[in-house]
């Protein structure tokens, strides 16, 4: 029988994880007793490690006398044993300064976030560009550019603007265009794509059927929203592939089989980061959460992700723009460091977007970043 998970066994599990993360080598009981000066014998520690193995928190590689953590062991560590840490003040200042250099340049924030995450967490990083949580229509304006052509300016909440030309009948006055655009703006006010499609099918406003031209304008808006939603599927940016590939997991130990396994893992890693396959299902979960998400090894639904841990956090301004950022690496990961890095960068990006939109962010379990 494995017995209870006593305080001492929890301490030993924590030390095994700490040692394995540092060395990438299976941990022996003698190592823990000697290095950490434990007040018990190596035989006692060995018995506790055997109990932890029976509980599913450690495993015993066939080629070694030591033990390594399982996914369940890492999960218990993250939820129960890990001490919450923060980046040092010097690191925070350095990171804030880098973002200050591109302040107001939204398109560069994501790339910079990826670079900083990879360098600080010593693993690969991933991020999505900020986008509207759910596209909502705001207004429509029609501008005559020719007697048979008008420019439709479609505005969505979050500052997103789409422009498109459309043919008009000769003789339509600017007042006709203004009136039709105003009616459509009132009809579709704050509508999501699904709601706009419903209103287009009903084709009435205040009980009065829409004219053919007004129906054309509604259909134009619906098509623009549909195209935007399709194009706005999260593109996943990444950085730090060399940081990740420097980990021992990607280096062959000896022999042809080891080399082939290392090459296959390298190929799979590059495919994950290039295509986003395996990561894409995690994005909606992270967007729906207000905190840091940690997915460890076998917890992934995708088989290709079973050797990796992913730490993600949402950033952005609710009701305006939101995105996701995080790190990916082997399950043998420095979880406290990685989590604190993801949490800090997400908070900093949230503050930057809040400043851009002149709103106050609501409290969350993501630690606040100091002002730039």
UniProtKB/Swiss-Prot annotation:
The keyword Ligase does not apply. Keywords: Repressor, Stress response, Transcription, Transcription regulation. InterPro entries: GAF-like_dom_sf (IPR029016), HrcA (IPR002571), HrcA_C (IPR021153), WH-like_DNA-bd_sf (IPR036388), WH_DNA-bd_sf (IPR036390), WHTH_transcript_rep_HrcA_IDD (IPR023120). It comes from Chloroflexus aurantiacus (strain ATCC 29366 / DSM 635 / J-10-fl). This is Heat-inducible transcription repressor HrcA. Negative regulator of class I heat shock genes (grpE-dnaK-dnaJ and groELS operons). Prevents heat-shock induction of these operons. One of its GO terms (biological process) is negative regulation of DNA-templated transcription. Pfam families: HrcA (PF01628). The keyword Transcription regulation applies. GO terms for molecular function: DNA binding. HAMAP family: HrcA. Belongs to the HrcA family.
